[in-house]
């Protein structure tokens, strides 16, 4: 505990890091406050039915968790950051097929800014479609007509659509500000803080269910909590696991007027088992909202079957498709975020090489092969943890709301984002000659 307090003191001593953390916390507070600001013209006291449906888990429960309860509150942030996530998925997928986007991806910082601008405009377009669907869907989700104080006419719909679109744009801006001026990935942090906000209520519901209904009592609650920490530990191991590729560097020495190369020190290239982080989970989850939403627009028997299959997040078909999407997106996102050819070129320029592998293209091919080999078990493990809530609901019979945190999207996002943020703080400490946050807080001599 003493070392931990000393580490916090060292964090506070670094002015830039301190300011970034304060800014990040301030922005997160603003986002959480906005999640409780109800849309004008809606009586918040009559949203009980909507709250009950989202508290019960299911697809609405996940959506509500991603928005930090804003969906159930009919707040100005009801759409959350998901339209931005959807836009990012579309832009990255289009980058495979559209030469213009491929060109932008290779232009460095200027290309990245242009891609971000395209993503923002696409986010607005998605919001314009989703906002009216959300407003008209409130009635179908159990919100009575009396809750709409201004009625459901255009005098309510048009201003509310503008507010919802503005809310998502503002949330997107908050996330980008955290990324640029704060600490951590802003968009991921907004999702994480929303998930954490609904965690206590889900646990309380599980606790009350076990105790009041004589359904296992405190002993079963204790076992569930212990197993929950085991799953968290497994998730941390997945996020942190790496394969070390040994690299040697040649150095020149002069002997009798002649220069010769000798082997220098051995170093390693760390290739992460899960190099794509939590993005495959977020992307896959965003896509899983689509089938049920589209099927809900039709009253045909086929559409109803699709809606039933993909509306049950603990069902067989939902989890099979979800796991498959996670595996696909893990490979896809790893290919984007791990430029093995660039790593090989950088290694060649610095005089490094992998024993038995020619520098340059062969090294790039070798690194790509290794990444493909380690990504497969990593993606399977990621998919297994993602569908774990469905498994524990079927076997253990825990509350669906609590099950969402028993592995699955929610837990993986919390663990992944927390570790990523801690690593950024860690780098600041190491750069200022302090031991990292992962170890101690002692000043280095």
How does the language model describe each region?
Residues 1-105, 110-445:
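N-terminal cationic and glycine-rich segments that engage phosphates or anionic surfaces
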